[in-house]
């Protein structure tokens, strides 16, 4: 049986577009309302809930555990090219986390 949790977080970015895999120094830590059972495999599905800025906000998730995850707005980076300055106004990001 799967266990679900939901939440939302306010995110913005004042940093350049993140282009180095594994570098989560500019990510925001989110803690689940309740920890999932030890040994669980957890997935997180985030969605931007608002439209507060003209640039398209991409979302990056990292380090998902039974107690939380890291997230950041990362504006577009395509085909090896940065297509924006990386800064983005505050948006509301909703998320669903579940065991699988």
Say what each PLM segment does:
Residues 1-40, 47-100:
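Extracellular receptor-binding modules and their adjoining Ser/Thr/Gly/Asp/Asn-rich linkers
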